[in-house]
Amino acid sequence: MSHVLVNVAWPYANGPRHIGHVAGFGVPSDVYARYERMKGNDVLMVSGTDEHGTPILVEAEKEGLTAQELANRYNRVIAKDLCDLGLSYDLFTRTTTGNHEHVVQEMFKQCLENGYIYKGSQQVAISPSTGRTLPDRYIEGECPICHAEGARGDQCDACGNELDPDELINPVSKINGETPRFEQTEHYFLDLPALAEANKAWLETRKGWRTNVINFSLGLFKEVKPRAITRDIDWGIPVPVKGWIDNPNKKLYVWFDAVIGYLSASIEWARRQGDPEKWREWWNDPKCPAYYFMGKDNITFHSQIWPSEMLAYNGKGSKGGETGPMGPLNLPEQVVASEFMTMEGKKFSSSRGIVIYVKDILARYPVDAVRYYISVAGPESSDSDFTWAEFVRHNNEELASSWGNLVNRVANLINKNFGEIPPLDEDSMTNEDRGLLEEASAAFDVVGSSIETHHQKHALSEAMRVVGDINKYISATEPWKIKDDQARLGTVLHVAAQAVSDANHLLAPFLPHSAQKVWEALGGTGTFSPLPELKEVEDLDKPGFTYPIITGDYELGVNVHPWKSEAIEVGAVVPKPAPIFAKIPTEAVEEELARFDEALAARRAAEAERLAAEKAKLAAE
C-alpha cells in the first residue's frame, strides 16, 4: 500500500459553482481518488472554500452582508453541491478557520526568516471610494498596444499581451465605474527570482505532465519578478510581523494563503482524526506523490507560486535557509490541469449569466448522468463545449440504452429463470464465454493505466467498450431462446452477470451512485461505492465557529471494493430489477435553452441596473 495525496483546487466562495468549475477540478479528481482507493492505496483527498480577497468583499457589499457572512453562505452552498456530486473528500474545509490562519502565518514567518520574503513598495490601484486595493482584473480600459476596449488590468484578450493596470488608457473600476488612483504602498514580496532556479530544476524533472501544462509552466521562467504577497485590504489573514499584525488594512494576498490550504486542510484532517501528526505521512515522505487537480487558469499558482513557497519554507532556494518544523514539504508529483469548458459555444461567466449551476442541474437530472457527461466530454486536454443536445444524447444512448438496459436485461433474465445467480457449468462453456470473461478481466489493466496517466476519457471509453461487447454477447447467445438446457442457460447468464459486475467495477470511479444500484441488482449486499457526507463541526481553534465539512469512510475491504474482477456469489438472490438510468425526453433540450436565455436576459438587466445605481451614487457624492 502506498500513500497518495490528492489536492483539489479550492472553489472561491463568492457564489455557487457551475459545471465549468467542477469539470476542471471536481469530477476528474474524484475519479482519480476513487480509483487509487480501489487499488488499495491510502488516499488523502483535501480541499475547501477559498474565502479571502477583494471579490468576496465586493459581492458582500452588493448583498448588504459582511465578508464573513457571505463566505459562510457560499461555504454551505458549495459544500452541499460538491457533496451531492459525490466528490469523496476526506476533508473539505475552508480558509477562514483558525487552523488555516495558524499554518499560513507559520509558512510566512519561516519564509521570511530564510530571506525569501522581504519588504518593499509597489504602485497599486486604489479604489477612491473604499481605499482598498483593486485587483488587476477589476480594472479595464483601452489597451495601450492594440487599442481594443475592455482590456483588463492584467491582460488584453484581444491581442493576448500581459499588462499592468497603470498602462491602460482611461482605466475604470469594473465594480462601480470610478477612475482608480495609483499610489506607492508598502508590501511584503515573495522573492521568486531567488527561487526560480530551484523551481525550474524541479519542473524539468517532471515526467508525464500534459504537454500544455509543462510548456506553460516552463514558460513562466523566461522572466521572473518578485511578487507582492500582501494587499491593502481589511479582509484576509493578518500579516504576522510586528507593526503589521494589528493593522486592519494590511492582509496577506489571497493567493499566498489559498495554496497553503492543501497543507492546512491535511493538518486539520489529522487533528480531527485524533492523530495530529498523521498528515506527515503524505507531506514529509518523499515517496508519497501529490497530485493537484484544477483548471488551466490556476497553473501558475501550482507550478510556480506554491512550489516556490514550499522551496522557501524548506530553505532550498539560492539563499539557503533552514527547513521549518512542518517540513520538508513535498513538491507536486503532477499538476493535472484541465482546459476550459464553454456552454453552447459561450464562455462560462457567472457575472454575465452564462452559467449552469451545479445545484440546478442536479435538481433536474441524475447525478451520474452529469458526472458521465463531464467525464466523456470534459476539457481534459483541449477546450470542450457543454451542449444540452449532447448531454441528452450521451445519457440516452450510452447510459440508458447501452449500460442501464444491459444491467436490466441480465438481472431480469436471472430473476425470471433462476431467482438467484446460477452456477457456472464448466462443461457447457464455449470459447465465446471464456473470451468475454478474459476481456472483462483484462480491462482492469487498460482502464487503470489510463486513469493513472490522467487520460480519463480513454479510460471511460475502454470501460464502455466492454459494456458494448457484453451487449453483443447477449445478442449472440440469445439466452431467452434457451428453453431445454438449464445448465447452458445458467452458464450464459452467469458469464453475463460476471462481465456486468466487472464492468461495474470499471465504471465505479466515474459513476459511484449507479454503481451501488448495479451491485444490488446482481444480488450484492452492503456498500459497494461509498458516498461522501456533510458533517457540521466546530472550529478546532475558534470556539463557537461552526461550519460543514465534507468527509467520508472509504476503506478498502469494508466499503470500497478492489480494482479487480471479483467472483459473483452463486446463489445470491437477484430481485426483479428497477431501471438504473432513465431516458431524458428530447424536449428537455429546447426547454433548457429557453430557460438559459430567460435567465441570461434577467441577469444582464439586473447587472446594468446595479452598475447604473453605483455610478449615480458616486455622482451624488
Curated annotation (Swiss-Prot):
InterPro entries in UniProt: Anticodon_Met, M/V/L/I-tRNA-synth_anticd-bd, Met-tRNA_ligase_1, Met-tRNA_synth, Methionyl/Leucyl_tRNA_Synth, MetRS_core, MetRS_Zn, Rossmann-like_a/b/a_fold
**An annotated Gene Ontology molecular function:** ATP binding
Which residues of the sequence carry a binding annotation for ATP? 350
Q: Which reaction does it catalyse?
A: tRNA(Met) + L-methionine + ATP = L-methionyl-tRNA(Met) + AMP + diphosphate
Q: Which ranges belong to the motif 'KMSKS' region? A: 347-351
Its EC number(s): 6.1.1.10
Sorted alphabetically, the keyword list is: Aminoacyl-tRNA synthetase, ATP-binding, Cytoplasm, Ligase, Metal-binding, Nucleotide-binding, Protein biosynthesis, Zinc
State where Zn(2+) binds: 143, 146, 156, 159
The subcellular localization recorded is: Cytoplasm
Cofactor-binding details, from the entry: Binds 1 zinc ion per subunit.
User: Could you tell me which SUPFAM superfamilies the record lists for this protein?
Assistant: Anticodon-binding domain of a subclass of class I aminoacyl-tRNA synthetases, Methionyl-tRNA synthetase (MetRS), Zn-domain, Nucleotidylyl transferase
Q: Which HAMAP family does the protein's record reference?
A: Met_tRNA_synth_type1 (MF_00098)
The UniProt entry's sequence similarity note says: Belongs to the class-I aminoacyl-tRNA synthetase family. MetG type 1 subfamily.
The function of this protein is: Is required not only for elongation of protein synthesis but also for the initiation of all mRNA translation through initiator tRNA(fMet) aminoacylation.
Identify this protein by name: Methionine--tRNA ligase
